[in-house]
């Protein structure tokens, strides 16, 4: 990536609809796509699943970056997501997520500020904004809950 743009390649791998995708920056990290039987063989992510995972990864990266910038030491972080599908056209109409954060000396106000900043700074969130309803929440894990997530 030399000018801020991204390049990727997607290649058909069988006689159905299994594909492998790579990016120019990660040519050795293959992402497999497929679809449900009988159209596919269920040997990879479906497109909307991968979109949900991509959204979650981008949002998580932004959240953790912001928390560390605030001087927080993160013991545990988990983001659970749910995508609500619509028909005609098939797409995600709503993404709901809940972040569970285990960090010392973090307040509810700091969590709320981090959520607002994440919405502004997350590239994938910005990409879906206006097309997909996003409802996000975050909560602080107790010390006991942190131990369960290790």
Language model feature labels by segment:
Residues 1-53, 64-150:
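Extended beta-strand/beta-hairpin segments
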Residues 61:
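Short glycine/serine/threonine-rich phosphate/pyrophosphate-binding segments
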């Amino acid at each position: 990536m030399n000018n801020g743009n991204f390049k990727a390649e997607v290649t058909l791998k069988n006689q159905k609809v299994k594909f492998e995708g790579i990016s120019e920056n990660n040519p050795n990290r293959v992402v497999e796509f497929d679809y449900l039987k009988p159209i596919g063989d269920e040997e990879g992510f479906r497109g909307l699943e991968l979109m949900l995972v991509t959204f979650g990864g981008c949002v998580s990266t932004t959240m953790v970056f912001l928390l560390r910038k605030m001087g927080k030491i993160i013991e545990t972080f988990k983001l659970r997501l749910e995508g609500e599908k619509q028909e005609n056209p098939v797409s995600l109409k709503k993404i709901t997520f809940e972040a569970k954060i285990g960090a010392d000396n973090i307040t509810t106000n700091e969590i709320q500020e981090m959520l607002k900043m994440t919405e502004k700074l997350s590239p994938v969130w910005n990409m879906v904004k206006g097309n997909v309803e996003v409802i996000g929440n975050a909560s602080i894990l107790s010390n006991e809950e942190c131990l369960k997530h290790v």
